[in-house]
Amino acid sequence: MGNKARALDEFIRRVEARFGDSVQEIILFGSYARGDHDEESDIDVLIVGDVDFDELMNIVTDILLEYGELISPIVLKPEEFGKRRDSFIKTVLSEGKVLYSSISTP
């Protein structure tokens, strides 16, 4: 497992521990999701949920200091994510990878 993968796993663990079911999904998108990232690439994630952005950025900063990897989160509230259908959302839905979900499926 590479450093980026370890950093991302730890980020998800900390977000889940801090915010719990307030986070519905964490979706990886961008170059890392497509597999065309390089050493300088950041890790793009979309977080669908009700989270305090300052607290989230504290986690991002801790990961950067501990792993040397920059995670770039975008946060959307669930109702906003459900309504938006712009090119960004379409790209995330088509190329993104759901890394975490608290949504139960039947």
Placement of each model-derived feature along the sequence:
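Catalytic core of pol beta-like nucleotidyltransferases
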Residues: 1-25, 34-39, 48-106
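Conserved H-loop
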Residues: 31
